[in-house]
Amino acid sequence: MTSEPRKSRGPFTPALFIASIMTAVNIQLLLLAGMCYLYGTASHQASRYSNLEILAISLDDGDIGTALTLASSQFDGRYHLPTVKIGSSQDYPDLDSIRNSVCKADYWAAVVINSGSSDRIYGIWNGSMSTVEYDPAAAATYIYNQARHPNIADSILLPGINALVKATTESFYGSSNARSALMNLNTSNVLLPAIKTYLNPIGTTADLIQPTPQLNRSFYNTYEIGLLFHGITGCPCLSMSVYIYAYRESWNVDGAVFCKSWMLYWLLMDIHWQVMETLIACYIPMQFSPFFVFPWIITNVASTVFPYEIMPAWYKIGYALPSSGVYTLNIHIWSGCGSQLGVALPALFVWWALGHITSVFAVRKRCSDSAKEPWSSSDST
């Protein structure tokens, strides 16, 4: 008994050619739309730097504290710099209270004129204090959480802080006490130290919340968020946590942080899996799955790449996405600081709960649809 020869494929028909072209065009449009959405997060970003607020506090009752207040009025949203808000020493009596305010994300950063700064400068000028006793960096302290969007913190907040300190110095030069003190110098043993102090009266000391100096920090809210789609078990999450921990360099995180991040990444992978399980091959045909998966990845990455304060208002829908909640929780795990937990935790719980509930119905629907499909003649013989 001879088998029937297999039929060769038909010619490349015009219909097949048109279908191939349409698929290629649709894929290109999908990529274009996705990347436009991602690039839109940085559109005219500099015009929104003023939405980042820096708290300015003077614990000094002298001229430097007054100069800070005068200089802060220049930072009102102009010049593509963060906005400076003047705080009261009654509300923030010490560095701990100011640091706590930044930790809670009430402000992105803080600049503090330390107590006694003016007296120390005038002590140099009148000869009652030696230059050995004076450190310009002790005049002011700046605070920000470097674990919270570190690239933005270093590229936007730090230049804003430096600009504020420079403006404070210029304002201090113009004070009547500073001018008269310098003009009244009359002894050579005081003149040289006084000039040195006059040229550099106000320096800064950094008091960073969770210093994050490693350069691979740029991947934490970009590449890593997109990579969390590549697995659904604890092993990929573990490997991700391992290489982040292994390349932490001088980053001060311990084993507890490592384990918490591992569990958090696992939660996010589980949410992504439940979303795919519910929709793909159930409500979205398999051939159209790229038109859902790619936008889902892009919108999740876009929700973490920049702070919402400097993105167009439309992107605030990212608060509802799971990746945004995971990055918010990661900041809290890494630094112990950050607000918006009241948004991140409920959002993640809703995604997780709904995903597990709807995936059950999705499986039932697929089984029901499969039972309704007739067997082909080739399979039934």
Regions found by a protein language model. Give the residues of each.
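Extracytoplasmic/periplasmic domains immediately adjacent to an N-terminal transmembrane anchor
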Residues: 2-215, 378-381
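Membrane-spanning alpha-helical segments of multipass transporters and channels
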Residues: 214-231, 240-381
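Structural signal for the C-terminal ends of transmembrane alpha-helices
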Residues: 204, 237-242
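Hydrophobic alpha-helical membrane segments, chiefly transmembrane helices and signal peptide h-regions
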Residues: 31, 35, 230-239
